[in-house]
């Protein structure tokens, strides 16, 4: 009986802590966007985000940060990594902070409203129980990086470098590359922020969010 109560207490504690972290990340995300992005349309974009699952959605269905709030957490991680890369390359005041905020915070906007929760049977201690898991249900099959550019462009005007950076942030993992396109090489050569955005995304995914390593 005591063991069962302790298990439930631990579950409730973790649930509360996870909700607090999600709210903290949401507050941080909105603050950064409002402080660093002064472009027309940003307020409308943030208001729209409040009506979506952006702040509660996972970053993936089964890979990095496949958990509630993972998408926002990943976006913050990429933003922080991109800031550090730009400061290392150009110095603290040698890069466009607004562009970095737009790219870092919104590069995965395409994942908004694409994940659904379903149930499946899992055996625990010899007993079959139902567990929730994430599935993909994309009602706007526009691609990945290019979809984020498309969605963002409905609210704010992007510079060419911002659009290229978001469009190609997956680098060699992009499905277009797997289909034979190597245009991302041209983008990386011509637009430095595109390369840095890809590196930031990889660092966040494989260093900050690698559960096997952490």
Where are the model-predicted features located?
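Positively charged N-terminal leader segments that act as targeting/secretion signals
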Residues: 1-11
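Non-catalytic interface/linker regions that flank or bridge core catalytic/transmembrane domains
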Residues: 13-57
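Generic amphipathic alpha-helical segments used as scaffolds and interaction surfaces in large
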Residues: 32-36, 69, 153
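Short amphipathic alpha-helical segments and their helix-coil junctions
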Residues: 56-61, 83
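Divalent metal-dependent catalytic cores for phosphoryl transfer on phosphate-bearing substrates
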Residues: 61, 65-67, 73, 87-212
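Buried hydrophobic packing segments
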Residues: 75-82, 152
């Amino acid at each position: 009986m005591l063991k069962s109560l302790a298990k439930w207490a631990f579950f409730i504690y973790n649930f509360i802590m996870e909700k607090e972290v999600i709210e903290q990340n949401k507050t941080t995300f909105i603050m950064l966007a409002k402080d660093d992005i002064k472009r027309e349309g940003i307020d409308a974009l943030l208001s729209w985000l409040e009506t979506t699952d952006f702040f509660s959605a996972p970053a993936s269905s089964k890979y990095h940060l496949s958990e509630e709030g993972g998408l926002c957490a990943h976006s913050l991680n990429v933003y922080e990594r991109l800031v550090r890369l730009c400061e290392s390359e150009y110095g603290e005041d040698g890069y466009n902070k607004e562009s970095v905020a737009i790219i870092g915070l919104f590069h995965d906007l395409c994942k908004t409203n694409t994940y659904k929760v379903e149930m499946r049977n899992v055996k625990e201690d010899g007993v079959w129980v139902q567990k929730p898991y994430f599935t993909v249900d994309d009602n706007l099959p526009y691609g990945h990086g290019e979809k984020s550019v498309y969605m963002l462009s409905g609210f704010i005007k992007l510079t060419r470098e911002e659009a290229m950076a978001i469009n190609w942030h997956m680098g060699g993992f992009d499905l277009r590359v797997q289909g034979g396109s190597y245009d991302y090489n041209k983008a990386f050569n011509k637009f430095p922020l595109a390369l840095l955005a890809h590196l930031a995304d990889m660092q966040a995914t494989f260093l900050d969010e690698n559960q096997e390593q952490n």
